[in-house]
Design a protein with these regions (language model features):
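Canonical Rossmann dinucleotide-binding motif of NAD(H)/NADP(H)-dependent dehydrogenases/reductases
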Residues: 43-76
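The beta1-alpha1 cofactor-binding region of Rossmann-like NAD(H)/NADP(H)-dependent oxidoreductases
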Residues: 82-83, 103-115, 148
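Active-site Tyr-X3-Lys motif and surrounding loop/helix of classical short-chain dehydrogenase/reductase
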Residues: 114-121, 140-141, 149-156
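Conserved mid-core segment of classical short-chain dehydrogenase/reductases
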Residues: 136-152, 195-198
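Active-site helix of classical SDR
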Residues: 166, 202
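Residue(s) in the substrate-gating loop at a strand-loop-helix junction
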Residues: 186
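SDR active-site lid
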Residues: 215-306
């Protein structure tokens, strides 16, 4: 049976008609009305929240900032690229949202403290911090000469940057009686893999820091770890030192991975590309930044009493092992 036989034809993006005449959106509304749930269109727990997003001048961080801004959050756009952060904040305001910006180097504790102070001075609260800034210098130990500086930077941004962000908002969140820290980790932090010693170590550290914060702050600060798999288009690929180091995460699937990548990003026909780039299909190959950003918004868009503490976001047809 061909793969497409497993995929019901959608009547529109995100809408499927059932035998009882309900599409999936209508069904979600029915479930919400019966059990008082907060899923889907009924949820409105982003509006009014003060949300700091780091690494938000471009790529995935920008998408998160724009999406929460569109849902009524008061957004603090932070990035080492101050002009880029200013542009994103301006775009949110132009779309009818509320946003400010600050040029912020998350490796500098003073910068992150200043970022938190700006949020409090402007909005009198910090409800959510999205620790998103990060780099991914994949390389083997044999690449140490070429990778040394990138590895140092990786530790500073991915590990120290997360810690600086947490400590910058911690006192304010405790004082106001609630808060939510969303740390962007990775499946690379799940297990040791070749070609990713330093990057994986930083993400494993983020997982441990997150769980420690959750345990120390129960009933006061919610903590969510988001573990994406491969997400082309976020800009992370630009920091890879040795592309062959991807082998650690795909292992024996490397050849198939390359074939799929060639179809999706290279010489594939429109029909072939659609087979692997349509999230409505079970063969969906790589999570898009937009799809991932939507999941981050989802974990924020919960009542204060509900905490989604850990979420792994995968494409169902991917080749990653862990």
């Amino acid at each position: 049976m061909p793969p497409e036989a497993w995929n019901p034809k959608p009547s529109g993006r995100g809408r499927r008609t059932r035998r009882d005449g309900l599409d999936n959106t209508a069904l979600r509304h029915r479930v919400d009305s019966r059990v008082g749930g907060t899923i889907g269109p009924m949820s409105d727990h982003v509006r009014g929240k003060v949300i700091i997003v780091t690494g938000a001048a471009s790529g995935f961080g920008r998408l998160v900032a724009e999406k929460v801004g569109a849902k009524g959050a008061r957004v603090v756009v932070a990035d080492i690229d101050a002009a880029g952060a200013e542009s994103v904040a301006a775009a949110i305001r132009a779309a009818g949202g509320e946003a400010i910006h600050r040029g912020t180097d998350v490796t500098d504790r003073g910068d992150t403290t200043g970022l938190a102070a700006l949020a409090v001075d402007t909005y009198s609260a910090i409800d959510v911090l999205v620790n998103n800034a990060g780099i991914m210098p994949l390389a083997f130990f044999s690449d140490h000469a070429a990778a040394a500086a990138a590895w140092d930077r990786c530790i500073d941004v991915n590990l120290k940057g997360v810690l600086h962000g947490i400590t910058a908002v911690y006192d304010q969140m405790i004082a106001q009686g609630h808060g939510h820290v969303v740390n962007i980790s990775s499946i690379y932090g799940n297990v040791p893999v070749v070609g990713s010693a330093v990057y994986s170590a930083t993400k494993a550290a983020v997982n441990v820091i997150s769980e420690s914060l959750r345990a120390e702050s129960q009933g006061r600060i919610k903590v969510t770890v988001v573990r994406p798999t491969g997400v082309p288009g976020t800009g992370l690929g630009a920091s890879i030192v040795n592309g062959e180091a991807l082998v650690g995460l795909v292992g024996q699937n490397m050849e198939l991975f390359r074939q799929r990548a060639t179809v999706v990003f290279g010489a594939g026909s429109p029909d072939a590309k659609a087979e692997f780039t349509d999230p409505e299909k079970i063969t969906y190959w790589a999570i898009s930044p937009d799809e991932l950003a939507a999941q981050v918004v989802y974990v924020i868009d919960q009542p204060w009493g509900v905490s989604i503490s850990d979420i792994t976001v995968r494409a169902s047809g991917e080749q990653y092992l862990f």
